[in-house]
Regions:
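ABC family nucleotide-binding domain
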Residues: 19-169
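ABC-family P-loop ATPase nucleotide-binding domain
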Residues: 1-28
Length: 169
């Protein structure tokens, strides 16, 4: 595995770093006998942006899927504000409601509107009511400037607009 880490930090002038928001400790992931990640360690501090750069097949997406609990790591720990995120679905749902990731592929459903795409995950993953999912989707779409497009089909959007819908989701 040839995984290269580059970390850039963005902070307001005079901002002091605090405790890590996310801590990854000795995270390893194997698929059968194939070890994809081996004892990865890093923290995400308040105000930091982490950029992961590596060759194709080096484990970047697998790492992010483990951090977002879309994959279960073989060993190691993921902590959110010091609390380990285990395999209990409620803990995972609470964690996912606070931490999001946008992958290179937006994975928007073309047979659904922008609003329906945003509501789907909160309904299926976080088990929110239709009303709660609607309110949350509208709030997030407003935050990314996509509220005027709630009835649009993803095929009608530019790449940047699709990216913003994926962030809102």
């Amino acid at each position: 595995m040839h995984l290269q880490w580059n970390i850039w930090t963005i902070r307001k002038e005079g901002e002091i770093m605090g405790d890590a928001i996310i801590s990854v400790e000795e995270l390893s992931k194997s698929f059968g006998q194939h070890e994809v990640l081996r004892k990865i360690d890093f923290n995400v501090e308040p105000g930091e942006i982490i950029c992961i750069v590596g060759s194709s097949g080096s484990g970047k997406s697998t790492l992010l899927r483990c951090i977002n609990k879309l994959e279960t790591q073989t060993s190691g720990k993921i902590r959110y504000h010091g609390k380990e995120i285990g395999a209990v679905q409620k803990e995972i749902n609470d964690y996912r409601s606070k931490v999001g990731m946008v992958f290179q592929s937006f994975n928007l459903f073309n047979n659904m509107t922008v609003l329906q795409n945003c509501m789907l995950c909160t309904r299926k993953v976080l088990h929110l009511s239709k009303e709660e999912a609607f309110d949350r989707a509208i709030t997030h779409l407003k935050q990314v400037g996509m509220a005027p497009f709630i009835n649009a089909n993803p095929t009608q959007l530019s790449g940047g607009q699709k990216q913003r819908v994926a962030i809102a989701r």
